[in-house]
A protein has these predicted regions:
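Rhodanese-like catalytic fold shared by cysteine-dependent sulfurtransferases
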Residues: 2-15, 22, 32-64, 73-107
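Short hydrophobic beta-strand that contains or immediately precedes a catalytic carboxylate
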Residues: 25-29
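Short, surface-exposed ligand- or partner-binding patches at beta-edge/loop junctions that are enriched
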Residues: 68
């Protein structure tokens, strides 16, 4: 029913971790209030409704991008916009899940 809530597969994890090793920028597309309640250290907060207007700025970073949100739905929307603009982008799904994956790699 809520397929966007599924856990990232091992293949997805590998791709995302490889992108992080290449210097990927994590964009949290939740609203600023949600972002302040918890986020991945070093991530940038660009709400999903602002992604289209920030495409050129994001493109200039010249780095892979990983989008996250609360459930994975808004980050999927942002991924579609960025992908259509030719940006290398991955949907990291829920921010707290990606934070756990990153922490496990560090440990």
């Amino acid at each position: 029913m809520f397929s966007f809530l599924k856990k990232l597969s091992t293949k997805d994890n590998s791709s995302i971790l490889a992108a992080i090793e290449k210097g990927a920028v994590i964009i949290d597309v939740r609203n600023p209030n949600e972002f302040r309640q918890g986020n991945i250290q070093g991530s940038k907060n660009i709400p999903v409704n602002e992604i289209r207007s920030k495409v050129e700025m994001i493109r200039k970073w010249n780095k892979p991008v990983i989008t996250v949100c609360l459930s994975g739905a808004r980050s999927a929307t942002a991924k579609s916009v960025l992908s259509a603009a030719g940006i290398e982008v991955y949907n990291g799904g829920p921010w707290y899940s990606l934070r756990k994956i990153i922490a496990q790699q560090i440990a």
